[in-house]
From Swiss-Prot:
Name of the featured protein: Protein translocase subunit SecA
Binding site for Zn(2+): 823, 825, 834-835
Pfam families associated with the record: P-loop_SecA, SEC-C, SecA_DEAD, SecA_PP_bind, SecA_SW
Signal peptide boundaries: none
EC number(s) given by UniProt: 7.4.2.8
Protein's membrane topology: Peripheral membrane protein
Family from the record: Belongs to the SecA family.
Originating gene: secA
Amino acid sequence: MGLFDKIFGSYSDREVKRITPIVDKIDSLGPEMEKLSDEELKQKTFEFKDRYAKGESLDDMLPEAFAVCREASTRVLGMKHYREQLIGGTVLHQGRIAEMKTGEGKTLVATLPVYLNAIAGKGVHVITVNDYLATRDKEWMGQLYEFLGLTTGVIVHGLTNDQRREAYNADITYGTNNEFGFDYLRDNMVIYKEERVQRPLHYCIVDEVDSILIDEARTPLIISGAGSKSTDLYKIADFFVKKLREEEDYTIDEKAHAAMLTDKGVAEAEKAFGIENYADANNMELQHHITQALKANYVMKRDKDYMVKDDEIAIVDEFTGRLMEGRRYSDGLHQAIEAKEGVKVQRESKTLATITFQNYFRMYTKLAGMTGTALTEETEFREIYGLDVVVIPTHRPVQREDHSDLVFKTAKGKYDAIVEEIIETHKTGQPVLVGTTSIEKSEYLSSLLKKKGVPHKVLNARYHEQEAEIVSHAGELGNITIATNMAGRGTDIKLGEGVLEVGGLKIIGTERHESRRIDNQLRGRSGRQGDKGHSRFYISLEDDLMRIFGSEKLQSVVDRLGLEETEAIESKMVTKSIENAQKKVEGNNFDIRKTLLGYDDVMNKQREVIYKQRSQVLEGENLEDSVQAMIEDVVTSAVQAHLGNIDEDDFEKELGDLIKYLEDIMLPHGKFTVEELKTSSNEEITRKFIECAREIYKEKEEFVGSEQMREIERVIILRVVDTKWMDHIDDMDHLKQGIGLRAYKQQDPTQAYQMEGSAMFDEMINNIKIDTVRYLFHVKVEAEKPQRERVAKETGASHGGDSQEVKKKPVKKEPKVGRNDLCPCGSGKKYKSCCGREVV
């Protein structure tokens, strides 16, 4: 704590002081609320809604609404909010992060701002880390909301669209970040507005906010369809890298989590694949496959980064140890790991829609979060999300003793000492929770305990199903639980009978995590609600953190002391050195996330433009003027491209090419000739082409009817936009993969990505116009009463958020035309190259 904080109190102290008068006001309303009958208490909700509709702000209603919620909670749940919980609720309503220690009742705290903000009638979302917690909290707290006249819903995996829509239309909706994010993406892929399930994003409270907004920030949500590329090259690249020798043919950079070929390795690749220059742009695909094969074989570790389960590769969440079901590494890394492990290599998928959690959650009008550990990441929360962190005081003083770290020379010495400590503690009956950083290490420690005949339970990704059950018993007398990192987070560890008498729950950390926050979370499992407890971390100089980021100074101290394998040192200097190593890694990880956000912000602005225009089309905006403007733009830009600034000698050739080009898109074959137009000015040519195209379009509309034509325009525009957007996502991804090399040319990669990405976006918009006009002029429909289903079918449009791409072909009510026959439209081209071409 700095001198300023000692004199004036910390930022959180000052904020809590500021909120105290509001809490006093809530307290003073208590007796008044106690006098109300159940029905009168419920009527308060409708009174608040009426006052809100008349212009009273939620801030003004806060003391009264919180007092109503507090009284209802006492009656329905038998739980009355403490003053500290009222402070936490106020912080959450203000759109901030409330740091509340484990066991301080975060679930109950959230009911206050959730109730108040639900009064606005715009929907409140409560985000949890898994389906189990979402369902539990909805059922538990739903009793309170329903008593107060509000509706609740829960979004879990496997619901139908109608069930999802119903849940989102409730006043309060619980669910996981994945479900909310995927629903947003799917809503922006539908053909009919009635198929959307979400309402506009209004107010959101994220439980375990650090886990979702920071730990998962680097993992984008992706909806994908099957790709078409062969998987053979992954197997060939894997076969090649398995023969390479470390240091000689490749090197590993543990800090960057990457592996690279040496000059000798490059020569080996050129020889093996029969190429002259490995670095040549033509060999980019090969470079990519070899790079991913190197990373898969020599950087990614089985049972730490991923597991092989049912002949498939399952990603292990590095922070929780849980399996990330349904998630795959992007950029071909997943396929490279599949090749390494000898399981079936799945085809690389095509991205249909994608968004990062960073950008999804920044779309809410108001965002708030709660967690036991946020202060260490305060800078990131403020810079990325505009959220500040307020530490809420605990209801009872923390009595847990956090002991200094013990540092050993070797990992073996460390594990021997841990086993010894567990055995000694077990004799007293004190329960022990041991935190490890990987499945591999938890199982290694388990094997050591088995050899000594010590009974214990192991909790990691392999036993995900029993997670909550095992964790809930971890505080019972004599229990020993080994857990991978934060597995079981969200489930309280309550102390069993007689445990306080033997010192409460003992926490043993088997090594320091890269992030201090994860260490604090482990410590926080003990000492809830003022209970006694103990915690200590055991560290060796062979641990990843110490080996990669630890200081040489610490190593030299250990060497000078001449420590034996079983001896440990314990000092403030050592702890400081370890914290500095962690700060270094945290800073490094923050920079990576910030850089990725810089790239994603470019895509985000483009996504917003596309989704906004898409929404306007869905909402029924009259598209007639837009289509006419597209026709004009396509003709004008084509004339400019062919006839602008050219030599007189080339004029007739370019004019002929222009006519052919526009005949392919919209003009009737043979209507215009070079002879007829060669004396006309560019402006005159443009005018004639536009007039002709408009005339043809008008005739088409008169034939099918205006209402049917507007519907056809809507479906075709949506599908062309979707197709081009999907291709653009791929193109931007490829651009990002190679953009890092710009640094060698003294260019800022982010700036280069922004400029080139912007040019690619403009090109995509232009191509959308061209394809939309082409399909509108080529589509053949019969005149009859418009039917949305039929129009969608005829233009090849699919319903809903289908993750597979849809092939669209114009429907013709004529005898079937062979793909190699001349096209009946009169263009002179083969049917497959003209009206029979596929839209996607």
